[in-house]
Design a protein with these regions (language model features):
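Nucleotide-activated donor-dependent transferases that construct or modify glycoconjugates
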Residues: 1-12, 175
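A short, glycine/small-residue-rich beta-strand->loop->alpha-helix junction that serves as a flexible
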Residues: 7-18, 45, 180-189
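Short amphipathic alpha-helix
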Residues: 15-27, 41-44, 194
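Conserved nucleotide-sugar phosphate-binding/catalytic loop shared by glycosyltransferases and other
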Residues: 33-65, 225-229
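Conserved nucleotide-diphosphate donor binding/catalytic pocket of glycan-assembly enzymes
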Residues: 56-152, 172-177, 181, 275-278, ...
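Nucleotide-sugar donor-binding patch of glycosyltransferase catalytic domains
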Residues: 111-112, 230, 234, 259-312
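Active-site donor-nucleotide binding/catalytic segment of nucleotide-sugar enzymes
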Residues: 152-218
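Donor-binding and catalytic core of enzymes assembling or modifying cell-surface/extracellular glycoconjugates
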Residues: 190-269, 273-276
């Protein structure tokens, strides 16, 4: 039995997107043992993935930390991997390749660089959609891809009956009005107005809820919506995924939870400004759609609510 390594460090949205590619790698190597190397936030989560046999932790310490680098590379070499699928495709993972398999081609180390089409360069190739890039990488590496273009993140779910009973959650609309502090361009400023429109229209038919991350709990209190926590702490990724999957509708900025919603077949809507496009991040699905504008400040709550009504 040979050993296969998949590398996927993060972020949350990236993890959800890669689910189909990971499944295809596993199903194309049924007689191999599948290892996945990731970072601490996703180490325990990936242990739940049925297509992975073992998870390896990469602390991603600085490259100049030679002691850490030495022990990590020594550990990886002991597995004697017959093939590596680099789904992170970062400068860091290219650095790892240069240490582990400096002369390897796509038959040993599959990445966007080793599978790059002859008629383009990496800069142009990276402008394509995420899932299309994964699909090309795996197909060019000789894999039959059935799931790459339609990732299913439902493997991350867990039972949340106790949380739903505590907050009396039956039919609910789940909002994610947050974004990373350094990416404020992604933030739509009218969630408070949207909440009022939803409540005026549906009254008690749907609860309006927010599930903040650990650093978003204080900000969440600014909104007229029920805040969903577990013992006064933010939900973990598995709980959050289940809450999203079982929702009636999701409205989110372009953040990790939006990508989860897209890839668990939840109904919903995500809002895009000029920072990128819904096509490039492969977020639109059968049940999950986007609104793309040049300036999120000019996207009215009424416009979002109208789209919500059409999709709900």
């Amino acid at each position: 039995m040979s050993n296969i390594l998949i590398i996927k460090h993060g972020s949350l949205g990236d993890i959800a997107q890669a689910s189909g590619a990971i499944q295809d790698i596993s199903e194309n190597h049924k007689n191999s043992k599948i290892y996945l190397m990731t970072t601490k936030p996703y180490f325990e989560l990936f242990k739940k993935n049925p297509y992975i046999n073992e998870v390896i932790l990469d602390k991603r310490l600085p490259k100049y930390n030679l002691i850490y680098l030495y022990f990590l590379m020594r550990k990886l070499k002991k597995y004697n991997f017959s093939k590596v699928f680099d789904l992170q495709n970062s400068s860091r993972t290219s650095f790892y390749k240069n240490i582990l398999f400096p002369k390897a081609n796509k038959n040993i180390w599959s990445s966007t660089k080793t599978t790059l089409p002859e008629d383009t360069n990496k800069e142009k190739f990276d402008k394509g959609s995420v899932l299309d890039r994964f699909n090309h990488q795996l197909k060019d590496s000789g894999l039959n891809t059935i799931n790459t273009l339609k990732p299913n993140f439902s493997w991350a779910c867990t039972e949340i009956g106790e949380i739903k009973r505590k907050y009396d959650l039956q039919k609910y609309i789940l909002l994610f009005p947050f974004c990373s502090p350094h990416l404020s361009v992604k933030k739509w400023p009218y969630f408070d107005e949207l909440i009022k429109l939803i409540k005026d229209k549906f009254e008690t038919d749907y609860k309006v809820i927010i599930a903040p991350g650990p650093k978003e709990i204080i900000e969440a209190k600014k909104f007229d919506a029920k805040i969903i926590l577990d013992n006064n702490k933010a939900l973990n990724v598995s709980q959050l995924t289940s809450l999203i999957k079982e929702s009636s509708f999701v409205v989110a900025n372009d953040t990790g939870p939006a990508h989860i919603a897209a890839h668990v077949a939840a109904k919903g809507l995500t809002l895009f400004g000029k920072h990128t496009t819904a096509h490039k991040v492969s977020i639109e699905r059968e049940n999950f759609k986007s609104i793309q504008v040049t300036d999120l400040n000019n996207l009215s709550a009424n416009k979002v609510f109208e789209r919500l009504l059409n999709l709900l």
